[in-house]
Amino acid sequence: MSLRGQVQIARSVFLLRIYILIWVQCLILMSVCAFCWLVLPHRLEQLFSSVRLTLSCLMISIVCLGLLRWAEPNFPKNVWILLTYTLLTSVAVTASGFHFSHRSVIYAMVATVTLFCFLTLATYLFARDVELQRSLLTGASTLILLLFAVFSLFPEAVSEILVMIAGLAVIVTSVVCDTQDILHDIEYESYIPGALCLYMDLMYLFVSVLYFMPSEPGSAHTAQTTVAATVAATAAASPQFVS
């Protein structure tokens, strides 16, 4: 078999396995949502009131990640996708956690994101000599100042609309420019980051389920238990990532 045929088979197997992972993930997510809908419907009514805040936080994250991609065009694509996935999910969970005053969820999420981002960046910094250049720091500082000016000078509704438009623009541009490149540059080894995406999503799903649990005085103990479980799970996944 020619090399081109082997590459096509590898791509097909990779896509098949990733879609299987996504399908399992969706089944788990729908099962949990159905359970919460049947058992705790009043919690879902509270969740709808925080949708606008969550979307605003997501769009701010997308703008920041778009800036990262512009400032560091040579940054590894699979690392960028993992960081995008991690940051967007964590911002949504944390924003809702603040809305519901679930401190244990927020503490667990901060620990999870910190550990995962550290492992992701450290692996590539030491193994592939990825260097974050000065343009990233300059661009990030400029973006922070612009966001501060937008939220200070404009009313709340206007600033949210501007952030949403900027986030959507980044999404559309990224999809149009990168879809063909991603399809042609798929490697079978990228299955490991895909599996890690599923692992992270299941962990975030576990943290999100804590929203539907009643607040108790022992929330500090719950936070310590969740953080400890997060540390152990992340440490167990790190050898797979490095390999």
UniProtKB/Swiss-Prot annotation:
Q: How does it sit in the membrane?
A: Multi-pass membrane protein
InterPro entries noted in UniProt: Bax_inhibitor_1-related
Name used for this protein in its record? Membrane protein US21
Question: What gene name is given for the protein in this entry?
Answer: US21
Compartments annotated for it: namely: Host membrane
Kindly state one GO CC term assigned in the UniProt record.
membrane
Looking at the UniProt entry, the stretches that span the membrane are 20-40, 47-67, 80-100, 106-126, 143-163, 164-184, 192-212
What is the disulfide pattern of this chain? none
What is the originating organism of this protein? Answer: Human cytomegalovirus (strain Merlin)
- Keyword Transmembrane helix present in the record's keywords: the answer is yes
Q: Which UniProt keywords apply?
A: Host membrane, Membrane, Transmembrane, Transmembrane helix
Protein family per UniProt? Belongs to the cytomegalovirus US12 family.
Q: Which PANTHER family match?
A: BAX INHIBITOR-RELATED (PTHR23291), PROTEIN LIFEGUARD 4 (PTHR23291:SF50)
